A protein has these predicted regions:
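Acetyl-CoA-dependent GNAT
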Residues: 2-3, 7-12, 16-91, 97-106, ...
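Short glycine/proline-centered loop/turn elements that form peptide/ligand docking sites
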Residues: 96, 100, 119-123, 140-145
């Protein structure tokens, strides 16, 4: 299923990602997270493991311009937004918001968590706009020693009307 969105006179869509997107996802990781790009095996895992919501944003030419993965942990009662990124030239068009919203909509659990570099205020603002609250920090989480801010959202309204199990 492709969801097309009209934003700032640009068209982009959101659809499921799969292993065929590995090359484009590697490039997106390299560009978006030069200090923290996921290794190849982790990318293969996120594109193939069961229980992962994986969505890509595509431009008018079908090129992958954004990606999000949500790790649904049913037995633990929550999900993690494992990664989300949008190529720099496409930022500010609502693509990150669209990816996050679409991923959350496919997660049928009441709690969603994520972590973000404490030195990434733009991403932190996005998550706060979506109702994520600061829960703590993980010191030295990133390879360069940077801290991760752990954030959490309780999807109370969604859970109440959808009847999540």
């Amino acid at each position: 299923m492709i969801e097309m969105v009209q934003e700032s006179s640009r068209r982009w869509g959101i659809e499921s990602a799969n292993l065929r997107d590995l090359g484009a996802l590697r490039e997106l990781e390299r560009v978006c997270f030069p200090r923290d790009a996921w290794p190849l095996l982790d990318l293969i895992g996120v594109l193939t493991m069961p229980g992962v919501v994986r969505l890509k944003a595509t431009g008018p030419d079908g090129r992958l311009i954004g990606f999000v993965a949500g790790d649904v942990r049913r037995t633990e009662g929550f999900a993690w937004i494992a990664t989300i990124g949008v190529l720099p030239e496409y930022r500010g068009q609502g693509i990150g918001s669209g990816l996050l919203e679409a991923c959350e909509a496919r997660i049928s659990l009441p709690v969603v968590r994520l972590c973000v570099r404490t030195d990434n205020p733009g991403a932190i603002r996005l998550y706060e706009r979506f109702g994520y609250q600061r829960k703590g920090e993980w010191v030295g989480y990133y390879a360069d020693g940077a801290k991760a801010l752990v954030m959490e959202k309780y999807k109370e309204q969604e859970c109440g009307k959808e009847g999540y199990n």
